[in-house]
Design a protein with these regions (language model features):
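Hydrophobic residues in beta-strands and at strand termini
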Residues: 46-50, 102, 150
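Hydrophobic beta-strand-centered segment that forms part of the acyl-chain substrate-binding groove
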Residues: 75-126
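HotDog/MaoC-like acyl-thioester-processing domains
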Residues: 25-44, 107-108, 119-177
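Catalytic strand-loop segment that frames the active site of acyl-thioester-processing enzymes
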Residues: 25-78
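Short, Lys/Arg-enriched N-terminal segments with co-localized hydrophobic residues
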Residues: 11-23
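Anionic, Ser/Thr-rich low-complexity intrinsically disordered regions
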Residues: 60-61, 69, 99, 103, ...
Length: 177
């Protein structure tokens, strides 16, 4: 069964998928006929640096996109699909689009908790959503999305389902569907 630890309203917590035995409100998750025992994803934290601020004393808008990439790479590392390992297999994952909505300002020295989650995945493309909150107050700072595809080194689209089923399985396990 799937569920969240914490207050149930935010994703400030570990995302946990458990095998039978604990009653939770979310749907059962099966991955290619096998239940997932337990998956824990830590949120990514970023400590805002002075050089990331603009003339108004707040974090420049371009930095949020960089933070999203840092959080996505951390997520990939946690699920066992580091970019370095994928590139060694000659799989690249360029950004197709990115969007960011600013809800409240981040200042120098703030710590932002970034919770990325894979919301769409079909073996050829994926979409990641990001939620950034203040570590101390929990206030929502920013939300965003990025979409990506999978290409070989020649720049041709590849299907992970067909070419790399073990990688496809890992992506499927961590996709919120």
């Amino acid at each position: 069964m799937s569920g969240l630890t914490g207050d149930g309203n935010s994703r400030h917590c570990l995302c946990i998928v458990r095998k039978e035995g604990i009653q939770m409100s979310e749907k059962e998750i099966e991955v290619y006929g096998k239940q997932v025992d337990e998956i824990k994803i830590r949120p990514y934290e970023h400590h805002a640096k002075y050089y990331e601020t603009d003339q108004m004393g707040i974090i420049h808008h371009s930095n949020y996109i960089k933070w999203m990439e840092e959080a996505r790479m951390d997520l990939m590392d946690q699920i066992g699909l580091s970019y370095k390992e994928m590139e060694a297999m000659e799989i690249i994952s360029p950004v197709l689009s990115v969007s960011c909505e600013y809800h409240s300002m981040v200042h120098f020295d703030d710590v932002v908790v970034i919770e990325p989650r894979i919301t769409k995945y079909n073996g050829i493309k994926m979409e990641v959503e990001y939620r950034m909150t203040d570590k101390v107050t929990g206030e929502l700072r920013t939300t965003g999305t990025s979409s990506h595809c999978f290409l070989n080194r020649s720049g041709r689209p590849i299907s992970l389902k067909r070419s790399y089923p073990e990688i496809d399985t890992k992506f499927f396990e961590y996709t919120d569907i």
